[in-house]
Amino acid sequence: MSNSAVSYKPIVNIENIVATVTLEQSLDLYAMERSIPNIEYDPDQFPGLIFRLEQPKVTALIFKSGKMVVTGAKSTEELIKAVKRIIKTLKKYGIKIMGKPKIQIQNIVASANLHVNVNLDKAAFLLENNMYEPEQFPGLIFRMDDPRVVLLIFSSGKMVITGAKREDEVSKAVKRIFDKLAELDCVKPIEEEEELEL
């Protein structure tokens, strides 16, 4: 079957967004620990305060410099909602917040399923910027330049994408790698493989 018969029908899921938030003011973490419930702060163990939200389910590490690291959001919208909820909670418990928080996405981790089988040996030989050592790790590691992401590609057609800064970069990367693998004749429909095993 030619690679043109392999259809593009991926399922892509954002698994985690890591972002930094800058408040441009210093924070009294001891005062926050005393007044806000369900906060963890042990400066002997870690310099930041740990703030967990249930809805959306994210964790924020808050530092006295006014910087935060927020993890766990599954979309940009969820990230913004979480930051707003954190700020609202801080204000509710008497922490004065001046100005608007500046949010910068540092990394988006996503998973994808191409619904094809990938010939990793062939892909490793034909693709540039890759590393494939199946005796060490079962996936092919591919470094893409545009968008600038790293993809872990498995023979099952499943993959992990890291390094994106925007959600649309994830979709673009998945489409580009699929097109490249199809062009190099490294993908086969799953049904074809299953028929060969019978």
Swiss-Prot record:
GO annotation (BP), single: DNA-templated transcription initiation
InterPro entries given for it? TBP (IPR000814), TBP_archaea (IPR033711), TBP_CS (IPR030491), TBP_dom_sf (IPR012295)
Q: Which GO terms describe its molecular function?
A: DNA binding; DNA-binding transcription factor activity
* Traits of the deletion mutant: In vitro depletion studies show decreased transcription. Restoration of transcription requires the TATA-like A box upstream of the promoter.
Keyword Repeat listed = yes
Q: Name one Pfam family in it.
A: TBP
Keyword set includes Nuclease: no
Gene3D superfamilies xrefs: TATA-Binding Protein (3.30.310.10)
Q: Which PROSITE patterns match?
A: TFIID
- Additional remark text: Probably starts with an ATC start codon.
Report the protein's function.
General factor that plays a role in the activation of archaeal genes transcribed by RNA polymerase. Binds specifically to the TATA box promoter element which lies close to the position of transcription initiation.
Xref: HAMAP family: TATA_bind_prot_arch
Q: What is this protein called?
A: TATA-box-binding protein
Species of provenance: Saccharolobus shibatae (strain ATCC 51178 / DSM 5389 / JCM 8931 / NBRC 15437 / B12)
Q: Which gene encodes it?
A: tbp
